[in-house]
UniProtKB/Swiss-Prot annotation:
GO cellular component, one term: cytoplasm
Chain sites annotated for binding ATP: 7, 34-39
Protein name listed in UniProt: tRNA threonylcarbamoyladenosine biosynthesis protein TsaE
Source organism (scientific name): Rickettsia typhi (strain ATCC VR-144 / Wilmington)
Source species taxonomy: Bacteria, Pseudomonadati, Pseudomonadota, Alphaproteobacteria, Rickettsiales
Family indicated by similarity: Belongs to the TsaE family.
Role: Required for the formation of a threonylcarbamoyl group on adenosine at position 37 (t(6)A37) in tRNAs that read codons beginning with adenine. Is involved in the transfer of the threonylcarbamoyl moiety of threonylcarbamoyl-AMP (TC-AMP) to the N6 group of A37, together with TsaD and TsaB. TsaE seems to play an indirect role in the t(6)A biosynthesis pathway, possibly in regulating the core enzymatic function of TsaD.
């Protein structure tokens, strides 16, 4: 578990985390509304696509795809999904072929996913302070 005391610390932590990701990784991001899931994803995407990449939250259209030189990043937001099967209408099977997948609000579809999965859990401690834990295959994942 890591205590992130500011937005800057969260940004740096997400950048370090991104350095450990590769194609075929599936990252599940969980936390209450406003915990920083999209913020965390934004830093991961910038790591691979460049800091000037225009990153749009997938909250309303459920999916944003970003291209890197070697793979795509599929950024899903499941907050408004009513049925787990809806993920297949969003190109999920295609996403599984050598791409990096980021899924916010993943609880509704987690049972459909095949391990290994990387789970990022963010908890609000106060205004800009967060508690972050990362698990991979039921083990705490510490890359620092």
């Amino acid at each position: 578990m890591h205590t992130l005391n500011s937005e800057k610390e969260t940004k740096n932590f997400a950048k370090l985390f991104a350095q450990n990701l590769k194609p075929n990784d599936i990252v599940l991001l969980n936390g209450d509304l406003g915990a920083g899931k999209t913020f965390f994803c934004r830093e991961i995407i910038k790591h691979f696509c460049g800091k000037n990449t225009n990153i749009i939250s997938p909250t309303f259209n459920l999916l944003q795809i970003y291209k890197t030189p070697n793979f795509n990043i599929y950024h899903y937001d499941m907050y408004r999904i009513k049925s787990p099967e809806e993920i297949y209408e969003l190109g999920f099977e295609e996403a599984l072929n050598g791409n990096l997948i980021l899924i916010e609000w993943s609880e509704i579809i987690k049972h459909l996913l095949t391990p290994p999965l990387i789970e990022v859990n963010l908890k609000i401690l106060d205004n800009n302070k967060r508690l972050c834990s990362i698990k991979k295959e039921n083990f705490l994942f510490d890359f620092l």
